Amino acid sequence: MAATLTPEQITEYKGIFEMFDEEGNGLVKTDDLESLMSLVGINPTKRDLANMAKDVDKDKKGTFNCDGFLALMGIYHEKSKNQDEELRAAFKVFDKEHKGYIEWDTLKYVLMNAGEPLNEQEAELMMKEADKDGDGTIDYEEFVAMMTGESFKLTQ
């Protein structure tokens, strides 16, 4: 699975892994996984962290090796890529004229009528929070932040 990582990412992640390999034996304590992940800019939920720990510590010894960590990072990057593709597709549905942004009225209509509909006040509050630059439209970065609850930088 590490095949989805670039050589630069592999080098970076190996270096970070080695920082946590206190005994120099090629192993890192599963308890250090959260710190390791946050150092690479990933802040998983407690539940996701528990699942990640199970994935890398198959023999339940409380440690994992670099290959396991690289596999985990490969899976993470693959999921991120898939999420990005899904979000781009959703954005295109709303940006029918390919302007690069979603009109306030279009988004408000969707928020009030699709999925778990919001009332008008909730929809407007969500859009105000999402419209970081205050221009009355939602661009792709703002859309992703709104949908994922985090800021997102385009990876191009």
Swiss-Prot record:
Which tissues is this chain's protein expressed in?
Expressed by the venom gland.
PROSITE patterns recorded for this chain? EF_HAND_1, EF_HAND_2
Where on the tree of life does the source sit, at the highest rank?
Eukaryota
Domain (EF-hand) ranges:
8-43, 44-79, 82-117, 118-153
* UniProt subcellular location: Cytoplasm
Record keyword Calcium present: yes
The residue ranges crossing the membrane are none
Q: Keywords assigned by UniProt?
A: Calcium, Cytoplasm, Metal-binding, Repeat
For molecular function, the Gene Ontology terms on record are:
calcium ion binding
Question: Which residues of this UniProt protein bind Ca(2+)?
Answer: D131, D133, D135, T137, E142
**InterPro entries membership:** CALM/Myosin/TropC-like, EF-hand-dom_pair, EF_Hand_1_Ca_BS, EF_hand_dom
GO CC terms? cytoplasm; myosin II complex
Q: Which Pfam families match?
A: EF-hand_7
> Mainly resides where?
cytoplasm
CDD domains from the UniProt entry: EFh (cd00051)
Question: What family is this protein classified in?
Answer: Belongs to the calmodulin family. Calglandulin subfamily.
User: In UniProt terms, what function does this protein have?
Assistant: May be involved in the cellular control mechanism of the secretion of toxins from the gland into the venom.
Q: What is this protein called?
A: Calglandulin
Q: Which organism is it from?
A: Bothrops insularis (Golden lancehead)
